[in-house]
Regions:
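Conserved long alpha-helical elements within nucleotide-processing catalytic cores of c-di-GMP signaling
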Residues: 2-3
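Conserved subregion of the PPM/PP2C metallophosphatase catalytic domain
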Residues: 6-180
């Protein structure tokens, strides 16, 4: 599904010229539903979660839309969580709603994070529980002033310490961007 998603993003953004993140996700959903024959019975029951950002460095603005994934923005030690919509790109049971577009004003040294659910869903610790979103956000707040290289090391160390003897259950992707 990821390869299909990458191909669709290129087609929608480059070939069709769609610029708004909410419209891009809407077009992706339509094309995935069509290509997997999801509008009819017997089609593949597959979808994709995604965070999509469009960063305008000159205007210091980020546009964000998400399908089951969020954007975390940390500015001056204040964390803002911009939630993605509770719907995938692809098969949707129930009402098909447009995706939401968030526009976030940025300042120098702000941090942006997009991430999969793998880090926070990982089992570990003394009681074998999930890491959870609140703990993940606290970790990002603790480390956001560090260089991005150091943040990577700290996230990896925390994950390794948390999982200890537990097997990794999902892919883990955390992407951080410092605004300069």
């Amino acid at each position: 599904m990821s390869m299909n998603g990458t191909s669709l993003l290129n087609e929608i953004i480059i070939d069709k010229g769609v610029k708004d993140t909410d419209k891009i996700l809407g077009e992706m959903r339509s094309q995935i539903i069509k290509s997997l024959h999801q509008e009819e019975d017997g089609g593949q029951k597959d979808g994709m979660d995604i965070s999509l950002c469009k960063l305008n460095i000159k205007k210091k603005l980020v546009e964000f839309s998400g399908a089951h994934n969020s954007l975390i923005h940390i500015s001056e030690d204040e964390l803002n969580n911009y939630r993605g919509d509770h719907q995938p790109v692809g098969l949707l049971l129930g009402d098909k709603k447009p995706f939401t577009k968030h526009e976030v004003k940025l300042k120098k040294n702000d941090m942006l994070y997009i991430y999969s659910d793998g880090y926070q869903d990982q089992f570990g610790g003394e009681k074998g529980k999930k890491y959870m979103g609140a703990k993940f956000k606290k970790q990002l707040l603790r480390i956001n002033k560090e260089s991005t290289d150091k943040q990577l090391i700290l996230l990896e160390e925390e994950f390794k310490s948390w999982t200890h003897n537990y097997e990794q259950i999902d892919d883990v992707c955390v992407m951080g961007v410092r605004i300069t």
